[in-house]
């Protein structure tokens, strides 16, 4: 995890989309590798949930699949395929580096929920990264 002013996709050789700098704010970004171990496609941008906590302050995370020159929460990951996922939130610069930072990423444990929208009632595992 790191603080950045802008978020770029992996392919910036031609036309691409990115998340631009906003005055007085920074993105807290985690780039993670997601492997779909299921037997059908998955929509990790829709069916997973992320949250950040910085020194007790809570922020909702956004989950975007890095698809070359673009990002999107609607991109799917085929069975047995791997994708890079950008999990991020926009925070005021005043909280940047102000204490322990934690990312919690909740992923359903049952494949039947991997093609819909996330619900707290789904059985899920929480993966936590702390810095």
Regions inferred by a protein language model and the residue ranges of each:
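Conserved functional micro-motifs across diverse proteins
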Residues: 1-131
């Amino acid at each position: 995890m790191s603080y950045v002013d802008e978020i770029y996709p992996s392919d910036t050789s031609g036309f691409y989309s990115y998340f631009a700098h906003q005055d007085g704010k920074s993105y807290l970004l985690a780039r993670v590798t997601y492997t779909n171990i299921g037997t059908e496609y998955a929509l990790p941008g829709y069916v997973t949930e992320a949250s950040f906590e910085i020194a007790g302050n809570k922020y909702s995370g956004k989950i975007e699949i890095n698809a070359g020159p673009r990002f999107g929460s609607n991109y799917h990951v085929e069975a047995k395929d791997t994708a890079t996922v950008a999990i991020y939130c926009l925070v005021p610069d005043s909280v940047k580096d102000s204490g322990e930072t934690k990312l919690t990423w909740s992923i359903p444990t049952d494949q039947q929920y991997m093609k819909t929208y996330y619900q707290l009632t789904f059985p899920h595992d929480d993966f936590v990264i702390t810095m």
